[in-house]
Amino acid sequence: MFAPIDPVKIPVFSDPWITMATLSGYLLFVLKLGPKIMENRKPFHLSGVIRVYNIFQILYNGLILVLGVHFLFVLKAYQISCIVSLPMDHKYKDRERLICILYMLNKFVDLVETIFFVLRKKDRQISFLHVFHHFAMAFLGYLYYYFHGYGGVAFPQCLCLLNTAVHVIMYAYYYLSSISQELQRSLWWKKYITIAQLVQFGIILLHCTITLAQPDCAVNRPLTYGCGSLSAFFAVIFSQFYYHNYIKPGEKSSKQSAIHKNL
């Protein structure tokens, strides 16, 4: 069995078998067992639990965001244009580990959101995009930690400034929309969360491209290619989601209005 490249392990998920069992159980429950169990049951009312979960996610992601910004722009532990993991004896190595551990654990906390969808029978929200995104972030992030170690190109660039910032906005929206139907209808910025996610993927892809264009940048190039490719793939499927949910309905409304005018 391979051993993690960094001797400092992630709490709970240091054993790859626990990680694989957790992710396999997630897929089995949200795609098969959960819907089967809920088939003849009424949806659970989890409003209070979900509000607490949303507040927790806002605070958790906010903490990682603050730590990440401090790490990048106050401590200046990385050269932004060429992000390489800190050596084991670097004075900021423990800070790098802490941020990455918090981020990795949060990717497993994110899986709970899909379980809420199953228990509330929100089948439409259990889409390929949703399940794949959550699974891939936890699974690929874990493989990155296990074989590469903490930090480097796949972490603080998207972790500190982009991914966690988007999640703070997203969970703030979820919390506010859960308070009442009236407040939910007044929240006009839902689609801009998806736009922010698309901008995030674009920035990550651009950063990976700039990194790879520097022959003297000592990053792990296959991992950088992988990070950029995954960002491009996410950009495509999130763009499809945006089109089908925000552009296409408007096109249908415009066509219907034109038909009525011509009658």
From Swiss-Prot:
InterPro entries: ELO_CS (IPR030457), ELO_fam (IPR002076)
Topology in the lipid bilayer: Multi-pass membrane protein
Catalytic function, reaction form: a very-long-chain acyl-CoA + malonyl-CoA + H(+) = a very-long-chain 3-oxoacyl-CoA + CO2 + CoA
A biological process from GO: sphingolipid biosynthetic process
PROSITE patterns referenced in this protein's UniProt entry, alphabetically: ELO (PS01188)
Compartment annotation: Endoplasmic reticulum membrane
Keyword Protein biosynthesis: no
A Pfam family reported for this protein in Swiss-Prot or TrEMBL: ELO
Top-level EC class: transferase
Keywords tagged on the record: Endoplasmic reticulum, Fatty acid biosynthesis, Fatty acid metabolism, Lipid biosynthesis, Lipid metabolism, Membrane, Transferase, Transmembrane, Transmembrane helix
Organs and tissues of expression: No expression in adults.
Enzyme Commission number(s) from the entry: 2.3.1.199
GO molecular function, a single term: fatty acid elongase activity
Main location: endoplasmic reticulum
Entry's transmembrane regions: 10-30, 55-75, 98-118, 135-155, 159-179, 193-213, 223-243
GO cellular component, one term: endoplasmic reticulum membrane
Main function: Condensing enzyme that elongates saturated and monounsaturated very long chain fatty acids, to yield products up to 30 carbons in length.
PANTHER family the UniProt entry points to: ELONGATION OF VERY LONG CHAIN FATTY ACIDS PROTEIN-RELATED, FATTY ACID ACYL TRANSFERASE-RELATED
Family (UniProt): Belongs to the ELO family.
Protein name in the entry: Very long chain fatty acid elongase F
Organism of this sequence: Drosophila simulans
